[in-house]
Amino acid sequence: DLTYWGLGATDHLVTAWIALSEVNVESGCMQFVAGSHANQILPHEDTFADNNLLSRGQEIQVQVAEEDKTDIVLRSGQVSLHHGRMIHGSGPNSSEDRRIGFVIRYVSPDVMQEVAQKDYAMLVRGVDRARHFVHYTPPPSLFAPSHLALYEEIREAKKQAMMAGASKSSTLYD
């Protein structure tokens, strides 16, 4: 993940993937490669493949043996945590049900956006002395106009970070 987020090779970040539906091998659960978070950032290739849901169709350029992968099977409401350098991915959903998840990234305030002009975060604890992020608060109501405009600003900043250096554009941000 750190390869294309524009946040550098930080250890001060963790991703929480919250299952909102059952997630198993048949539905294409995530797979982790144990210990891979200790690697440096690995080279990726932008495939822009139709069957890859990532913004650039990013794929790491290393071969991972099947026996090194661990299936992360979750029941609805369970959470998995992973480091931004953890090799991870998922296969296709071949079940009759949807695979639904929600992602939250916890980032220390000392982390800094390196490729986009700015980045946004919601402070959840403590004090941000570094001030590397534009802070925002939860919306006051559903579809509040001020926060819909803010959403568009955040989306544009994410596009700038995620697509920096890409050879072509992505429809993800259209």
Model-derived features: positions:
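Short, conserved beta-strand element in jelly-roll/cupin
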Residues: 7-25, 73-76, 81, 104-108
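Non-heme Fe(II)-dependent double-stranded beta-helix
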Residues: 1-8, 45
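Conserved catalytic motifs of the protein kinase core domain
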Residues: 13, 28, 99
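Short clusters of hydrophobic/aromatic residues that line enzyme substrate/ligand-binding pockets
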Residues: 5, 30-32, 124
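Double-stranded beta-helix
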Residues: 25-91
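Short, structured patches in soluble enzyme cores that scaffold and shape functional sites
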Residues: 2, 18-22, 34
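Non-heme Fe(II)/2-oxoglutarate
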Residues: 85-87, 91-174
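Short, surface-exposed loop/helix-turn segments at secondary-structure junctions
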Residues: 1, 55-65, 96-98, 116-123
